[in-house]
Each structure stands twice: as C-alpha cells, then as structure tokens.
Design a protein with these regions (language model features):
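Single-stranded nucleic acid-binding proteins centered on OB/S1-type folds
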Residues: 1-282
Length: 282
C-alpha cells in the first residue's frame, strides 16, 4: 500500500483531521528516526494512533512449478487446472477422503492432492478444469514415480481465479497439448488431444505374480499425424465401456515409450487424466 493510500484511509475515517496535520506528524516521525524508515511504515504508525487499522498487503512470492522440490513445508503456487480426478475415500486408523487434480503454468505440470474438507471444492463444482487457482500453505512430497506433488491440508488455502495474477502467464488448456508430429523420446509425460481412429477391444493378461490386468489399444490422430495409445488396467476397463471410433479425446499426463519395434507409443495409466468430448478444437 502506498503512502498516499494510507493517508486517504486516515482521512476517510477521521474527516476532522487535515492532510497537513498528517504530513506534519510524518515529518516529525522522520526527524526522530533520521530518515531511516520508509514513509509508508511511519504512516502506519500514525494511522494506528488514530485507531485506523491498515491491513498488510498480501504478497506472494512467485514460485513456478518447475522450481518445486519434495520436502517443502509452506508452498504457494499458482496454475491453471488442466484435469480434475474424482474424489476417493480411504479407511484405516483414520478415515477421510481425497481428490487430485493437475495444474500447469508455462513451464510444467503438477499433481495436486486435496485432503478431506478441501475436497468439497471439487464435489460442489467450485473448482474445475480451466480455472486459474492459487494454492497457499501446501507441502510437497515425492510420489511413487519420484515426481514432486503438492498436498493441501487443513491449514492450506485455495483461491479460485485470484485477482492479482496475469492470466496470459497460464495458457488455456488446449495450449498444453503437444502435436503428434512433435513427440519425441524426450517427452516422458505429455498432454495430447486428438480423435480416435482405430480401436481394439480390451483384453486381460496374467502378470508374473499370477494377478490379472487389462490392456486396450487405439490410435489417436490430430492434424499432424497419428500415434498408438496403450491403456492399462482400470483406465482400460473404464474406456473399454465408453470409447468409440471418431471420439474426441484429451489425455493429460500420458507417458511416451518406445515399443519393441522402436516406434513411439503413448501409455495411459492411473496417473493419466482422460476426457472424452463431443467436439474438440485444435
């Protein structure tokens, strides 16, 4: 808050006080401190004497997703929501619920975990894909795949569409997609959009520990090319019931691998967000 804004707040609460009186008080304080303290700080002291509370501005240290590391305990980060996963419950010594979502800025994508009461923002539809959201007082952990993720607990705060941000620093969801002809082995995790061109039925297989799994394959195409997609386990069971030829598809956090023939494939697992839509603009 500027010095002028503080003066205006004092005047609005105490119209009997003149601007000159405030400035005289300011000069007196400056002479006492030898000019070593900023005018804004001195004016806050003067305001307090008049019983006027000047709230501190909320200052957020800008932290990009790519700078996050596991083990941080008081993190504030902002991103555009690109995927929202359904809430889940858990049982044990304590029971509760959690939900996860994916956010992104210009540099990277981050998985965010909401715990217990925070999940209500997803259940009520207040928090959804496409929004810019600021997450404050979170903590970072390493997931099972050695990726950093952000957790939001009781003391955390979530601000949907904060006012003091630049929207152009958080591209729209479609801008995160990589064109198929630009995919390389260097893309470990990727966001893709396209149309289903070939679709093969889901099938089961037996693992080395004799447990069973499910696999499904299809071909995804955009205006630049095509790529085979391999879908695993619960995602295969889910898509096997609903996916059709010519369906428009969005994949967030798919994994790129080489098959036995040296060709690139996109792999979809529980970490991948899948959205089927009627129409998709490239």
């Amino acid at each position: 808050m500027t010095a002028e804004e503080i003066i205006q707040q004092i005047l609005s609460k105490h119209p009997e006080v003149s601007r000159n009186q405030i400035l005289e008080n300011l000069e007196a304080e400056k002479s006492k401190t030898g000019g070593l303290i900023a005018d804004e700080t001195l004016l806050r002291l003067i305001a307090a004497r008049y019983g006027v509370e000047i709230l501190q501005d909320r200052v957020y240290r800008k932290l990009s997703i790519s700078h996050l590391v596991p083990g941080l305990n008081d993190v504030t980060v902002t991103g555009r929501v690109v995927a929202v996963y359904p809430p889940r419950t858990f049982e044990g010594k304590k029971s509760g619920k959690f939900a996860s979502l994916m956010i992104a800025d210009k540099d990277a994508v981050l998985r965010v975990i909401l715990w217990n009461d925070k999940v209500e923002l997803i259940e009520t539809g207040e928090l959804k894909a496409g929004q810019i959201v600021r997450f404050s007082h979170g903590y970072t952990r390493e997931d099972r795949k050695d990726k950093v993720e952000l957790h939001l607990g009781n003391r955390s705060q979530i601000e949907v569409e904060p006012k003091n941000i630049k929207a152009d620093e958080y591209p729209l969801i479609g801008k995160f997609a990589t064109k198929i002809n630009k995919i390389t082995k260097a893309h470990e995790n990727i966001h893709l959009t396209g149309t289903v061109k070939e679709l093969f039925p889901a099938s089961t297989f037996t693992r080395s520990d004799m447990s069973t799994g499910t696999i499904m394959r299809f071909t995804l195409a955009d205006e630049t090319g095509e790529i085979p997609v391999v879908v695993w386990n619960e995602k295969a069971e889910e898509l096997g019931k609903s996916l059709k030829i010519n369906a428009n598809l969005q994949l967030v956090n798919a994994k790129i691998k080489e098959n036995t023939n040296g060709k690139l494939e996109a792999h979809v697992n529980s970490y991948t967000y899948v959205e089927v839509s009627e129409r998709l603009d490239f």
